[in-house]
Every structure is written in structure tokens, then in C-alpha cells.
Amino acid sequence: MTVSEFPDTQDKQPSIPISLTRVGVTGVKKLIKIKREDKRPIILIPTFDAFVDLPSTQKGVHMSRNPEAISEIVDEAANQSEIHLENICANLVKRLLEKHEYALHAETEARGEYIINKLSPVSKRKTQETTHIIARAIAMKDDEGNISVRKMIGAEVIGMTVCPCAQESVEKDSKDKLLEFLDEETTQKVLDVVTFASHNQRGVGTILLEVPEKQDVNVDDLIKIIQDAMSSPVCEILKRPDENRIVTNAHQNPVFVEDCVRNMVIGLLEKYPNLPDDSVVTIKQVNQESIHQHNAYAEKVASFGKLREENKE
């Protein structure tokens, strides 16, 4: 029997005529090879989720069309000289609306691990660092069949933070003890050259940036902005001179969880001064505390227009 000869159960009327917001597939893994001029290609194995809405007049979606659309778009991307994961998602949501003619809304998300090659700060040993990248896209179809697309690219990066509050307490305590046997001038000279202890956190910074379909954002830029927002980047391979450099630098740049989010805001505004005002960004920082059982959290969600207004104040 051909496909057309089998009954199409999905097209039947549902017994309960209620529309559904999202129906689709999750956890579809694909290999993507991103070509780079004069460089080795980047290999990603992202996991895709893909959904469409379902009207109240239809029993079910044609589920096989979703993984079929994912395979088609990924295969087409393999022949392109430059491709971004968020553009794959943007193309995918448009393809989903083509395949599901009854749908008015399509949404997809892709998550994967992105490997960055770097050198340790002093010994210059080669190391690979893993970051998580997230891409999403949403497509809407109006009454005339016109499709509009918004896409999002994001990164989640691990770094190190140092608590400013505890460090100031340690400095004050050290100063009081030094003044017991040193004069004020000598004590200040000691304080000026000593790096004071504090408690540390493993920080996890996230930027999710939503932009129009024709606007491109480099995920490497987002990764650097997140790294620079914390007290120090981290590195997988560290010899003792490397450890000393990272720990010293981090303690010379203490930041609260709130500071990290604000630093990311400034980094984005400086790197992308021409992004449209309606571009929406979500910035999150989670610091995994070393002296508490809880973690510290801060977040900012705003349009670029709003961020520009606040930064002028």
C-alpha cells in the first residue's frame, strides 16, 4: 500500500475540540559540521526540539514531519560555507510551517556543547574548554500566509568569582593586626601590595539574545562577554604558575553576582551598539557558593532599547 492508501488518523476530528499550544518531538540529535575558511571545521552534535501548534479541529499533528524537517535542514546546511546554529533553527521553523499547513506557530530549540581551544595563562599549555550553546527560533503565520521569524542565540559559560564583601572584611582585619606593630604609612604600603583572601564561587553566566531573522550575532562574542564579566576565566589544565596567576587575578577583581550581570549588559552594549531596540536579551548569573549551602542568583531581562536608556541615566 502507498502512503495515501493508509488512513490519516491525525486529520480526524478530535473527541475533545481543544487546541494545543505546542506538539512535536524532543531530543533529536544531529551531527553538524560547520565549515571555516583555512581552519578545521567545527563539529557540533546538538539536540533539537521542534513543535507546532494544533488547531481544535484536528486530532493530531503529523509527527514524522518534524524529524523529517530537522534532517532536511541539517543536510542543506552541510552544503553552506558558513552557518550558524540559530539560522538552522530559523530555517527549520519555516520548514515546519510549510509541512504543517494547519499550523500558525512553529518553535524549535537546539542545544549543544561547543569546544574552544585555548592556552593556559603562564605555561601556555593547550587545553580544550567546553561551553554550552543554545539556539531557538519562533515563526508565526498571519491570516494572509506571511511568515515572520525571530531567532535567539545564547551561551552558558563557567568562570570564577570572588566575594568583595568577605575580602574587605579580611583586609580590615589584616590592617588592624598590622597596626599593632607598624605605623600607618608602612601598613598602607603593605596593604597596597598584598592580595587579600576571600571565599570563591564557581560562576555560571548565561546570555540569551533574541534578534530579527536577518541579524547575525557571533556566539564567540557572547562567550567572551560572559567570561570577562566574572572575576576570572577558568582553565582545564593548570600548572602551579597558572594557578597562581588565575587565583591572584581573580582576587584582584572581586565581583558580586549582581556585578556579573551588569558587566554583561555593558559588554553587550559595547560589542553590539547597532542592534535594533526590539532585540531582547536575557542575562543570568548563578554563583555556586563555597561557604553556604545555597547559591546566589541574578538576572536581567530587557530590550536593547531599554538597556540603552538605563545606561544613559
Swiss-Prot record:
It catalyses: GTP + H2O = 7,8-dihydroneopterin 2',3'-cyclic phosphate + formate + diphosphate + H(+). InterPro entries: GTP_cyclohydrolase_FolE2/MptA (IPR003801), GTP_cyclohydrolase_MptA (IPR022840). One of its GO terms (molecular function) is GTP cyclohydrolase IV activity. The record marks C163 as: May be catalytically important. Binds 1 Fe(2+) ion per subunit. Its EC number is 3.5.4.39. Pathway: Cofactor biosynthesis; 5,6,7,8-tetrahydromethanopterin biosynthesis. It comes from the Archaea. Pfam families: GCHY-1. It is an enzyme of class 3 (hydrolase). Its cofactor is Fe(2+). GO terms for biological process: tetrahydromethanopterin biosynthetic process. Keywords: Hydrolase, Iron, Metal-binding. Converts GTP to 7,8-dihydro-D-neopterin 2',3'-cyclic phosphate, the first intermediate in the biosynthesis of coenzyme methanopterin. Belongs to the GTP cyclohydrolase IV family. PANTHER family: GTP CYCLOHYDROLASE MPTA. Homodimer. This is GTP cyclohydrolase MptA. It comes from Methanosphaera stadtmanae (strain ATCC 43021 / DSM 3091 / JCM 11832 / MCB-3). The lineage of its organism: Archaea, Methanobacteriati, Methanobacteriota, Methanomada group, Methanobacteria.
